[in-house]
Regions:
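RNA pseudouridine synthases
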Residues: 1-296
Length: 296
């Protein structure tokens, strides 16, 4: 495939990873193997891209993996020949990993959706972006590589719409605002993320929807998509997500999980160019908790 550089100054490997669905590792492998051409010539990873450069790269062949298709309940909000939008329940892991080899969204997708994309040389059934196990809500899934590339580029260009609802601890001092703080792996706990000067830029916008004394219902819009971004940002400003097992206090709304829901998802359809927007109401336990908070 081919891309044209519009903003100069980055290393070739970083530009390739930023502008395509390829990971930085796969981008470097292709560069070392001479599979990446800049204006028809092989370049090293440290080459600084220039405006107008034409970069050619290979879409890796998909290697079949042994994830099993499982007949699990799957709330499909929308589906066509290119895209599926699913409403993931709280508690479901998106992708199989050590300790989570079954019961994941990918296992369910393999059963319900037969044609799925494979990017970076591995069959990751169409997963363009992820939400945490304990977060419920909307995810877009690509059914072919062309759709996957287009949707991934839209995410990187910050053109897609992703809004969440969360119940957070305390009362935010402002009705709306923006949290701009870089996020990277925590140096104290490698399993967690943290606001750190060494992290990647991260921006979250928030708007207060309702106040309940010790808790607040907020709508949060992602400008970037860092791991655990909303959870880290809200904890950083002193208002962690209620029920958050990693970033929240021990004293919280008990026994009901994490109150974070991906409620609104919008994107440009990769084939038709139509703007699509979907909304999934909060789960029943989330709504019941709101009712209880309103009663005081």
């Amino acid at each position: 495939m081919e891309i044209k550089i519009e903003v100069a100054g980055a290393r070739l490997d970083k530009a390739l990873a930023d502008l395509t669905p390829l990971s930085r590792t796969v981008a470097n492998e292709q560069i070392k193997e001479g599979k990446v051409l800049v204006n028809g010539a092989v370049k090293k990873a440290k080459y600084t891209v220039k405006e107008g450069d034409i970069i050619q790269y290979e879409v890796p062949e998909v290697e079949e993996v042994s994830y099993e298709a499982e007949d699990l309940p799957l709330d499909i909000v929308y589906e066509d020949q290119d895209v599926v939008v699913v409403n993931k329940p709280q508690g479901m892991v998106v992708h199989p990993s050590a300790g989570h080899t079954s019961g994941t969204l990918v296992n369910a997708l393999l059963y319900h959706v037969k044609d799925l994309s494979g990017i970076n040389g591995e069959l990751r059934p169409g997963i363009v972006h992820r939400i945490d196990k304990d977060t419920s809500g909307l995810l877009m899934v690509a059914k072919n590589d062309q759709a996957h590339v287009a949707l991934a580029e839209e995410l990187k260009d910050k053109k897609s719409l992703r809004k969440y609802w969360a119940i957070v601890h305390g009362n935010l001092p402002n009705d709306r605002g923006m949290i701009e703080a870089p996020i990277g792996r925590s140096e104290k706990d490698r399993k967690k993320q943290a606001v750190t000067a060494k992290g990647k830029p991260a921006v979250t916008r928030f708007q207060v929807l309702e106040r309940f004394g010790n808790y607040t219902l907020v709508e949060l819009q992602l400008e970037t998509g860092r791991t655990h971004q909303i959870r880290v940002h809200m904890a950083y400003i002193g208002h962690p997500v209620a029920g958050d097992p990693a970033y929240g206090p021990k004293k919280t709304i008990k026994g009901k999980g994490q109150f974070l829901h991906a409620r609104t998802l919008g994107f440009t359809h990769p084939r038709t160019g139509e703007t699509l927007e979907f909304t999934a109401e909060v789960p029943a336990i989330f709504e019941k908790t709101l009712e209880d908070l309103r009663k005081g």
